[in-house]
Swiss-Prot record:
It catalyses: UMP + ATP = UDP + ADP. The gene is pyrH. NCBIfam families: pyrH_bact. Belongs to the UMP kinase family. It comes from Francisella tularensis subsp. holarctica (strain LVS). UMP binds at residues 63, 84, 145-152. ATP binds at residues 21-24, 64, 68, 172, 178, 181. Keywords: ATP-binding, Cytoplasm, Kinase, Nucleotide-binding, Pyrimidine biosynthesis, Transferase. It is found in: Cytoplasm. InterPro entries: AceGlu_kinase-like_sf, Asp/Glu/Uridylate_kinase, Uridylate_kinase, Uridylate_kinase_bac. Pathway: Pyrimidine metabolism; CTP biosynthesis via de novo pathway; UDP from UMP (UMPK route): step 1/1. Its EC number is 2.7.4.22. One of its GO terms (biological process) is 'de novo' CTP biosynthetic process. This is Uridylate kinase. GO terms for cellular component: cytoplasm.
Length: 249
């Protein structure tokens, strides 16, 4: 892929403002737990590259590298609502780490949380988002929606709507959307592009239904891509080699 800035600038306008959904595990090393700054550095570098191109970028990060909330095996000892609240706190930890890693690379970044923490996290306020993004500041959304029983996918779709994103980029470890599980079926077919209607009719796995429906209703395309590929985030904006676009038509 060319690094020529003039070539990049010709491709970027259709994705001037994006919402990137990251899993918590993307910040950890191979063990999948905790935060490993070396493992996360390629993500930081690519975010910096995109901001240098003039892309306005907001992030939603999960907390699965610390605690998977409702998926945690607590039996009947901890209520699901409490577990989800613990998961929201995990996303706050990841968001603070991302903010500082970005700032260390000269990228202006700020964390907004569904639940504020005095002296630490600002409460998410939709009317501020446009001003902050227009300044070139990367926004990192933490704390989910502030409610239990809601996935990080839904948080991502909600924030994408609030910021008026041109697209929601969902970073995964699979290079797009398949007609069946590629980890189980060697003949699984990958789609370069698929419509929202086809996802429903073919029962394809893109993201949770609430998030998917919200993106469809607000005409926000979804790009599912493999973050583990070299320079995959920058490619998602420029060339889209490592994933699948979900569009209205």
């Amino acid at each position: 892929m060319s690094n020529d800035s003039s070539e990049c600038s010709q491709k970027l306008p259709k994705l001037k403002r994006i919402l990137l959904k990251l899993s918590g595990e993307s910040l950890s090393a191979d063990q999948g737990f905790g935060i490993n700054v070396e493992s996360a550095q390629p993500i930081i570098n690519q975010i910096k590259t995109l901001t240098n191109f003039g892309v306005e970028l907001a992030l939603v990060v999960g907390g699965g590298n610390i605690l998977r909330g409702g998926r945690a095996n607590f039996g009947n000892k901890i209520r699901r609502a409490t577990a989800d609240s613990m998961g929201m706190i995990a996303t706050m930890i990841n968001a603070l780490a991302l903010r500082d890693m970005l700032i260390s690379e000269g990228v202006d970044a700020e964390v907004f949380s569904a639940k504020g923490v005095d002296g630490l996290l600002k409460v998410a306020s939709a009317h501020e988002f446009n001003q902050e993004l227009a300044k070139g500041r990367v926004l990192i959304f933490a704390g989910g929606t502030g409610n239990p029983f809601v996935t990080t996918d839904t948080t991502a779709s909600l924030r994408a709507v609030e910021i008026g994103a041109d697209a929601l980029l969902k970073a995964t470890t699979v290079n797009g959307v398949y007609d069946k599980d590629p980890n189980k079926y060697s003949d699984a077919k990958r789609f370069d592009k698929v419509t929202f209607s086809e996802v429903v009719s073919k029962e394809l796995n893109v993201m949770d239904l609430g998030a998917f429906t919200q993106c469809r209703d607000f005409s926000i395309p979804i790009y599912v891509f493999d973050l583990t590929q070299p320079n995959a985030l920058v490619d998602a904006v420029l060339d889209s080699k490592y994933g699948t676009w979900v569009t209205l038509d």
